[in-house]
A protein has these predicted regions:
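C-terminal, low-complexity/hydrophilic appendages and adjacent surface loops
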Residues: 35-38
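Short active-site loop at a secondary-structure junction
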Residues: 42-55, 133-142
Length: 208
C-alpha cells in the first residue's frame, strides 16, 4: 500500500518521505499476459507526489492507535454475507502465502495461498505463529477500504491504477518488468528493484 497527494501541505516530514513524479504519457496495460490487462493503451498522467516506500507496520500502527480502526481481516464475518458457511469458519482470517511442497501451477492461486485464522497486519503469518509484524516491514492483510481509511487519516489519497503503474515503471514504457523485459537478467532474481521512483515492485502484494 502506498499513498499519494497532488499538492502536499508545507510539512517537511511529509515532503521528506515522498517523491514527486512528473506527469507524462505511457503505454498502460499489456496485450501479452492476463486478459484483464488488455488492451494496452496510451494514458496521460498529471504530476503527483507519492510515498517513497510502501506504508510500514509502524505507520499503520500509529493510525490504528490514533483512531481505534479495525481492519477487515480482524472483523468477525457476518453469516448473512456468507450463507451456508459453517459457524466454525466465521472467524477473522486472511490469506497467507504458503509455498507448495511440490511443483504447482502459477495460475492456481489455491496452491500458493491458504486461509489462516487470526492472520492480520498484527500477525501476518496467523494467530498461531509467534512472529509478529516488524515495524519497518510493509503492512499487509489490508483491504482496499482499510487503505482508504489510512490514506484519509494521513491527509493523502491512494494512487490510481495509472499513477501506480506510471511510477513503478520508472520511465520504461511498455516493458514487462520494472527493470526491463527479461524475467531474470544475467541469471539474477529481481525480487525488488530500485530502478523506478521508489522500490515498490514486488515488496508486498499490492492491492491498489
Amino acid at each position: 500500500m502506498v499513498a499519494r497527494v497532488e499538492r502536499p501541505q508545507p510539512n517537511i516530514f511529509l515532503i521528506d518521505n515522498m517523491v514527486f513524479v512528473p506527469g507524462g504519457t505511457f503505454r498502460m496495460g499489456s496485450d501479452r499476459h492476463y486478459p484483464e490487462e488488455a488492451p494496452a493503451h496510451r494514458v496521460a498522467v498529471d504530476g503527483f507526489w507519492i510515498d517513497r516506500t510502501p506504508v510500514t507496520n509502524a505507520q499503520f500502527d500509529a493510525f490504528v492507535t490514533a483512531t481505534g480502526y479495525v481492519t477487515s481481516a480482524e472483523r468477525v464475518p457476518l453469516a448473512a454475507d456468507y450463507p451456508g458457511t459453517p459457524p466454525e469458519m466465521l472467524q477473522p482470517a486472511s490469506l497467507v502465502f504458503a509455498q507448495p511442497k511440490d511443483s504447482a501451477s502459477l495460475h492456481d492461486w489455491r496452491r500458493w495461498w491458504e486461509l489462516r485464522f487470526g492472520a492480520s497486519w498484527k500477525r501476518p503469518h496467523g494467530k498461531d505463529d509467534p512472529r509478529g509484524a516488524q515495524g519497518d516491514h510493509p503492512v499487509v492483510h489490508v483491504a482496499y477500504e482499510d487503505a482508504q481509511a489510512y490514506a484519509a487519516w494521513a491527509g493523502k489519497d491512494l494512487p490510481t491504477e495509472a499513477e501506480w503503474e506510471f511510477a513503478a515503471r520508472g520511465g520504461l514504457d511498455g516493458a514487462d518488468y520494472a527493470w526491463g523485459d527479461e524475467p531474470m537478467p544475467q541469471g539474477r532474481f529481481m525480487a525488488n528493484t530500485w530502478r523506478g521512483r521508489f522500490p515498490d515492485f514486488n515488496s508486498a502484494a499490492d492491492g491498489c
